[in-house]
């Protein structure tokens, strides 16, 4: 999982835009051990309230369809 509070370095994953391919590439550049397998990988974005821009990328993940995404956080106001 990616926790935006405990690991603020991940707040740069949208630096190349909201395309899934760019986000996956940027996550992999930050943490080489993270592997993404289409149809098998679940990406967990935790503490979403600390990086609300990632919510905009969720539609890209839905359209792309290769990865399931789970988001969690506190004080989201949902």
PLM segments and residue spans:
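Phosphate-binding site recognition
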Residues: 1-78
């Amino acid at each position: 999982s990616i926790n935006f509070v405990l690991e603020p370095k991940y707040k740069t994953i949208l630096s190349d835009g909201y395309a899934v391919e760019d986000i996956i590439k940027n996550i992999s550049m930050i943490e080489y051990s993270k592997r993404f397998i289409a149809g098998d990988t679940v990406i967990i974005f935790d503490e979403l309230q600390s990086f609300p821009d990632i919510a905009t990328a969720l539609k890209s993940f839905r359209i792309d369809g290769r990865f399931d995404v789970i988001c969690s956080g506190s004080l989201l106001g949902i």
